[in-house]
């Protein structure tokens, strides 16, 4: 198929494919230049399906064009960073400290609300 559609040499006389058999298979050897030639001179098909394939990309571009970015909040970075500075290397955080860091990262707004004991939890739910 390739040999029917792509010439053996391009305009500069560089070989695009040769009739020498590829070792171990009965196919012709094709140069990477053939791809370039095809991209430049190959048949042009309709581009209707591109948006379908790159749907997410196109949608994202559209969103970015019309997008507004709300206020971005960075909270509690300092606290966590300081904690990391105090424990350099692989000194493991104590279970409690690890819990604190996780809580700070996962629930940034709840910082300072200590993990409630089951009793106080009960009274609240009551």
From Swiss-Prot:
It comes from the Viruses. Signal peptide: none annotated. GO terms for biological process: 7-methylguanosine mRNA capping; cap snatching; symbiont-mediated suppression of host cytoplasmic pattern recognition receptor signaling pathway via inhibition of MAVS activity; symbiont-mediated suppression of host gene expression; symbiont-mediated suppression of host mRNA transcription via inhibition of RNA polymerase II activity. Keywords: Cap snatching, Eukaryotic host gene expression shutoff by virus, Eukaryotic host transcription shutoff by virus, Host gene expression shutoff by virus, Host mitochondrion, Host nucleus, Host-virus interaction, Inhibition of host innate immune response by virus, Inhibition of host MAVS by virus, Inhibition of host RLR pathway by virus, Inhibition of host RNA polymerase II by virus, mRNA capping, mRNA processing, Viral immunoevasion, Viral transcription, Virion. Its main location: virion. InterPro entries: Flu_PB2_2nd, Flu_PB2_middle. GO terms for cellular component: host cell mitochondrion; host cell nucleus; virion component. It is found in: Virion; Host nucleus; Host mitochondrion. Belongs to the influenza viruses PB2 family. Influenza RNA polymerase is composed of three subunits: PB1, PB2 and PA. Interacts (via N-terminus) with PB1 (via C-terminus). Interacts with nucleoprotein NP (via N-terminus). Interacts (via N-terminus) with host MAVS (via N-terminus); this interaction inhibits host innate immune response. Plays an essential role in transcription initiation and cap-stealing mechanism, in which cellular capped pre-mRNAs are used to generate primers for viral transcription. Binds the cap of the target pre-RNA which is subsequently cleaved after 10-13 nucleotides by PA. Plays a role in the initiation of the viral genome replication and modulates the activity of the ribonucleoprotein (RNP) complex. In addition, participates in the inhibition of type I interferon induction through interaction with the host mitochondrial antiviral signaling protein MAVS. This is Polymerase basic protein 2. It comes from Influenza A virus (strain A/Camel/Mongolia/1982 H1N1). The gene is PB2.
């Amino acid at each position: 198929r390739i040999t029917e559609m792509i010439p053996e040499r391009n305009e500069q006389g560089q070989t695009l494919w040769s009739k020498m058999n590829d070792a171990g298979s009965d196919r012709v050897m094709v140069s990477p230049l053939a791809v370039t030639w095809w991209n430049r001179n190959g048949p042009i098909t309709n581009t209707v399906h591109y948006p379908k394939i790159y749907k997410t990309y196109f949608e994202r571009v559209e969103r970015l064009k019309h997008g507004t970015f709300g206020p971005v909040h960075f909270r509690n970075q300092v606290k966590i960073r300081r904690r990391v500075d105090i424990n350099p290397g692989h000194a493991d955080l104590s279970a409690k400290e690890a819990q604190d860091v996780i809580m700070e990262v996962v629930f940034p707004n709840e910082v300072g609300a200590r993990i409630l004991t089951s009793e106080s939890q009960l009274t609240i739910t009551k």
